[in-house]
Amino acid sequence: AGLFLLLYPTVSDYWNSLHQTRAITRYAENVAQLDRTEYEEIWAAAQRYNRTLPKRENAFALTEEQKREYESLLNASGNGVMGIVEIPKIGCALPIYHGTDDAVLQIAVGHLEWSSLPVGGGGTHCVLSAHRAFQSSVQRNAVSKSALAAAHSP
């Protein structure tokens, strides 16, 4: 039991890094395979979605139908990854997943489902969430508030 406790942080960090690398690689490969028309359709669908947000009756919760639509957008790899956050200062790249449940936040960055999708545009406000409560976040602890991060979507 003692050995397990000593090895857990290292094994956990390795496992999370492996998962993040695989998710980012799969995402990048799938986006690279999109032809220009597919890419533009994905982007336009996300922009249309963002324009509907201010018109919703409940701005902070999605209906089941809205949730299905949300999860289908910016999902080029089919595994829920909608983009990548890069923090060049520490050489860190993390996948951005749909939603912010505990399972997502343990391994990656989550997108708050009722906020704008990360495609930019006037009046949009994309909210990304991550926390530092697990071992593989050691790198992120070194990031100052002034560090620049970039989010990439298809």
Give a label for each model feature.
Residues A1-P154:
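Solvent-exposed, non-transmembrane regions of membrane-associated and secreted proteins
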